[in-house]
Amino acid sequence: MKAQELRNKNVEELNAELINLLGEQFKLRMQAATGQLQQTHQLKQVRRSIAQVKTVLTEKAGE
């Protein structure tokens, strides 16, 4: 998701997105630990998405 799309969301939607991404990250990490993860780039994508959401939440907290 692009940063501008994230900035258009409200705080509740961003928190829901963050919880969703953290759950997805957990699933991917478990798959990687058991050797079932085929597309390892997904871990990086999810980690960056989490960082983007947290950044936008911090920006909104400062407003």
From Swiss-Prot:
Family matches, as InterPro entries: Ribosomal_protein_uL29, Ribosomal_uL29, Ribosomal_uL29_CS, Ribosomal_uL29_sf
Similarity comment: family membership: Belongs to the universal ribosomal protein uL29 family.
Residues in coiled coil: none
Superkingdom in the source lineage: Bacteria
A Pfam family of this chain: Ribosomal_L29
Transmembrane intervals: none
Record protein name field: Large ribosomal subunit protein uL29
SUPFAM superfamilies, sorted: Ribosomal protein L29 (L29p)
Alphabetic keyword roster: Ribonucleoprotein, Ribosomal protein
PROSITE patterns xref list: RIBOSOMAL_L29
GO CC terms: cytosolic large ribosomal subunit
One of the GO biological process terms: translation
Gene3D superfamilies noted in UniProt: 1.10.287.310
GO MF annotation list: structural constituent of ribosome
